[in-house]
From Swiss-Prot:
It is an enzyme of class 2 (transferase). Keywords: ATP-binding, Calmodulin-binding, Developmental protein, Immunity, Innate immunity, Kinase, Lipid-binding, Magnesium, Metal-binding, Nucleotide-binding, Phosphoprotein, Serine/threonine-protein kinase, Transferase. Changing K222M: Probable loss of kinase activity. Increased apoptosis during embryonic development in an akt-2 tm1075 mutant background. SUPFAM superfamilies: PH domain-like, Protein kinase-like (PK-like). This is Serine/threonine-protein kinase akt-1.
């Protein structure tokens, strides 16, 4: 499905504003590719491999942009008649570079883009609103052998006690209403926590093990610098992570307790999974047994299936983002690259992710859908069972060629069921990939490799993990890099180089993060009626 409409097949030739051949620069393998582009009067800029045939429905585009509120810039080097368009890809601002056959052709395209952009600039109108339809939840065949898997994927186990993830959503709404007065009294700041150890450090900030003073509970707090987020144009990714964490409650997703902001920082207070990254454990063991890989794979499939049911594509599957909790269960972390509002058939084309884990359709400059996550699952499960990446080269161009055209190789010890699963997940064509159909995760649940899995028991954490991290206490950080845990716990003040920011500049920076704060009500439902926890219910800020 096109980003800008329910279906390109519903478009009409008479709605085309301008069309013709342009060369577009690839985003990964950065060569120039001829594409037949069309601008429609609703602001859609669609690119096709070949000119659409007259009198026939438009095919699905390779490129799909929205030029409402677009900006353009002209260049003459390294090629003449170049131009750059800064526009929207879903909710993300992106830049794409083109060149035309002549200055006159380029000017016609610039004029069309600017005319459309001016038409919609500053409006909240959705030119495709009349084409939108409700995304219906599928009905489950209760007599099916895989009914339990379907319930687990949807986060609706058909029986059993479950945990907070299975609590009726209406109960959470009641708890919000009942505790609104308490919420008004409860504003979370850094002063509410004791900082204990640094768990990780990156460009945008730090992750620190902390203890909430009021409850004495341990959390991992991710503290990000606002100025760096803005300078690196990561505002959209940061806000997406916040929204996804707020929306999604699942046993195998890291749970957000609070998000709040200080003058210079954004803070995510999250569950602390002290079993460390799966990457650490694979590196230590070399390979996992197939039963161990099956256990982790089943939990990952359920979590991603749940995200997909919420119309969210994860897009950053890698061993470093798969944590183990103290009992040995999976916790998927880091939701900054998620893309929202992507259901079956929907596409996006933003380049993101770790090079070794990128799916072929991403590298080939195609729009892609939720099936990229199943490619990522194929890569991490290959690493677990084979001890190496399926495709690897230090040279990124060579790496990308291997991902797009290389053959899979398996160690002789691998079972036929494991080979079939990995081969299905690592199919180059996303439409033929295991999980690529409308049933999504359920296709993978049916694989012979997962034949012995009780999916509902897996969801309820009733299956004993094959490995339990050897942690001595709640504050044990032995599975985290000593390079970080040995560092002093302190925050680096924002850079003061150059002139101090004006009041207007400060207000502009803060305006990027309005409505950021969140206090987790869902996680407190089971404690609503405990007198000692009367103040444990929080507001939505």
């Amino acid at each position: 499905m096109s980003m800008t409409s329910l279906s390109t097949k519903s478009r009409r030739q008479e709605d085309v504003v301008i069309e013709g051949w342009l060369h577009k620069k690839g985003e990964h393998i950065r060569n120039w590719r001829p594409r037949y582009f069309m601008i429609f009067n609703d602001g859609a800029l669609l690119g096709f491999r070949a000119k659409p045939k007259e009198g026939q429905p438009f095919p699905e585009p390779l490129n799909d942009f929205m030029i409402k509120d677009a900006a353009t810039m002209l260049f003459e080097k390294p090629r003449p008649n170049m131009f750059m368009v800064r526009c929207l890809q879903w909710t993300t601002v992106i830049e794409r570079t083109f060149y035309a056959e002549s200055a006159e052709v380029r000017q016609r395209w610039i004029h069309a883009i600017e005319s459309i952009s001016k038409k919609y600039k500053g409006t909240n109108a959705n030119p495709q609103e009349e084409l939108m339809e409700t995304n219906q939840q599928p009905k489950i065949d209760e007599d099916s052998e895989f009914a339990g898997a379907a319930h687990a994927i949807m986060g609706q186990p058909s029986s059993g006690h479950g945990d907070n993830c299975s609590i009726d959503f209406r109960a959470s709404m009641i708890s919000i209403a009942d505790t609104s007065e308490a919420a008004k009294r409860d504003k979370i700041t850094m002063e509410d926590f004791d900082f204990l150890k640094v768990l990780g450090k990156g460009t945008f900030g730090k992750v620190i093990l902390c203890k909430e003073k009021r409850t004495q509970k341990l959390y991992a707090i991710k503290i990000l610098k606002k100025d760096v987020i803005i300078a690196r144009e990561e505002v959209a990714h940061t806000l997406t992570e916040n929204r996804v964490l707020q929306r999604c409650k699942h046993p195998f997703l890291t749970e957000l307790k609070y998000s709040f902001q200080e003058q210079h920082y954004l803070c995510f207070v999250m569950q602390f999974a002290n079993g460390g990254e799966l990457f650490t454990h694979v590196r230590k063991c070399g390979t996992f047994s197939e039963p161990r890989a099956r256990f982790y794979g089943a939990e990952i499939v359920l979590a991603l299936g749940y995200l997909h049911r919420c119309d969210i594509v994860y897009r950053d599957m890698k061993l470093e983002n798969l944590l183990l909790d103290k009992d040995g269960h999976i916790k998927i972390a880091d939701f900054g690259l998620c893309k929202e509002e992507i259901s079956f058939g929907d596409k996006t084309s933003t380049f993101c992710g770790t090079p070794e884990y990128l799916a072929p359709e991403v590298l080939d400059d195609h729009d892609y859908g939720r099936c990229v996550d199943w490619w990522g699952v194929g890569v991490v499960m290959y690493e677990m069972m084979c001890g190496r990446l399926p495709f690897y080269s230090k040279d990124h161009n060579k790496l990308f060629e291997l991902i797009m055209a290389g053959d899979l190789r398996f160690p002789s010890k691998l079972s036929q069921e494991a080979r079939t699963l990995l081969t299905g997940l690592l199919v180059k064509d996303p439409t033929q990939r295991l999980g690529g159909g409308p049933e999504d995760a359920l296709e993978i649940c049916r694989a012979d490799f997962f034949r012995t899995v009780d999916w509902e028991a897996t969801y309820r954490k009733e299956i004993e993990p094959p490995y339990k991290p050897n942690v001595q206490s709640e504050t044990d950080t032995s599975y985290f890099d000593n390079e970080f845990t040995s560092q002093p716990v302190q925050l680096t003040p924002p850079s003061r180089s150059g002139a101090l920011a004006t009041v207007d500049e400060q207000e502009e920076m803060q305006s990027n993060f309005t409505q950021f704060s969140f206090h987790n009500v869902m996680g407190s439902i089971n404690r609503i009626h405990e007198a000692s926890e009367d103040n444990e219910d929080y507001d939505m800020g």
